Amino acid sequence: MINRISALLIFLSIGVSQKEYNIINLINQGGVYTQTFNDDILNGIIYRILDDKKVILGNLKNGEKDGLWTEWYPNMRKLEETYKHGILDGSVSLFYKTGQREWRHTYNNGQFEGLWTYWYENGEKMKEGSFECGDSTGIWIWWDENGHVKKEKKFKIRKKGIWTNYNEYVLIEVVKEP
């Protein structure tokens, strides 16, 4: 019985496998991808050839990016983006060549939303803060490469913030923006 179920699952997965398209053969027309030789809207897996290897970039649904997309730059830095219906929605991250994450941003329906974090190449946090409805909000903190707080800024949505600066890790000034 288990062998029959396994065989059926293999058959179904082969039968419904998605088409694959090389991105160099596609045209991006306002966020909708078509092939260069026709206007058919695409559904399937998108790849590119990198160092003679097929590298999966992401998935198209109704011609739009959907789900996790990974792009590799010539300097071997990696960018990961999450899309829903062709719009950034979720986590977006850029990585150093070493594989260490350089920054991670969050989007909701194409708008800045949630926690944004940046790191030094040594893995220490560089700065961190949040967005709400596309605006900086709450307390943003900046650190030096050794992990010591350099400055802070408190934001309120659609209002100026208050800067707190540190010198040698000691509070030196608080500046309220007009």
Task: Identify the function of each model-found stretch.
Residues 4-14:
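Sec-dependent N-terminal signal peptides
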Residues 13-178:
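Glycine/tyrosine- and acidic-biased, solvent-exposed loop/turn segments at the edges of beta-strands
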